[in-house]
């Protein structure tokens, strides 16, 4: 059922469909599902906010973390905080009431900040992939990734994110409630006159999903090849073999984390876009969005907690200046040094 500023995934044969801005949507799913959604959002908030805020705090506390590469990692934490503060809190609040209680303006604000955080995060991963490819594979001889390059990379993530999230605010597509009608996203659902949803969705999928996904797969594919070549050149070096396994594990986790977070949501959104008029339930879009929102937890775990330097500084901060695991970290220093010498360090 299509309204002036909403789309309900239900045929209004019984006349029960109501605006998601004004009435509870308990006719869509069991009311318990809204409680589950609220609890899930609360879980993401209590986990996502502390771990991303801790990342920012630790970086400010430890000067040695203020390196060009870590600018991009820090940008990931900022993006995740946008999602937590701007998106998860409003979704949790709306789910407690069973509908989007913040109105049309609130939908624009929530949709903008949630999408902005996701786009900044996605483009940060792409920039990080480019940085790893350039540093490890050295396609440009004598190139050194410096502060100016990092600032350019971070700026690029914001420019590309805004290029995707601002148009729906000014008339090229729009933000509407989706799934269980407690969160807002891009209008994949309608051909509403005057919004040109079709052209925007094609633009968004091409330049803000497929393109960064290609960058990530290309760069990490080349990175993996470089690690294997380095190991093949030093077959007797156990430390290099360990470095290869470490990088391989990290790359696999990066790709899996990316796909788990975004591929289900993007696939369902594209299906809805290309099959307008098909019947589907509210959970058809709500469940994939759960995976996309969980990226606020995956990102710091994969990209920061697996970084030795970040991990050491976090432990030092949490234990008030002392690292109780310092002996274990020293035992792994040989591997880290050999990894760096071979230009295959994952961190």
From Swiss-Prot:
It is found in: Membrane; Cell projection, Cilium, Photoreceptor outer segment. This is Rhodopsin. It comes from Sargocentron tiere. Belongs to the G-protein coupled receptor 1 family. Opsin subfamily. The gene is rho. One of its GO terms (biological process) is G protein-coupled opsin signaling pathway. Photoreceptor required for image-forming vision at low light intensity. While most salt water fish species use retinal as chromophore, most freshwater fish use 3-dehydroretinal, or a mixture of retinal and 3-dehydroretinal. Light-induced isomerization of 11-cis to all-trans retinal triggers a conformational change that activates signaling via G-proteins. Subsequent receptor phosphorylation mediates displacement of the bound G-protein alpha subunit by arrestin and terminates signaling. Phosphorylated on some or all of the serine and threonine residues present in the C-terminal region. It comes from the Eukaryota. Glycans are attached at residues 12, 197.
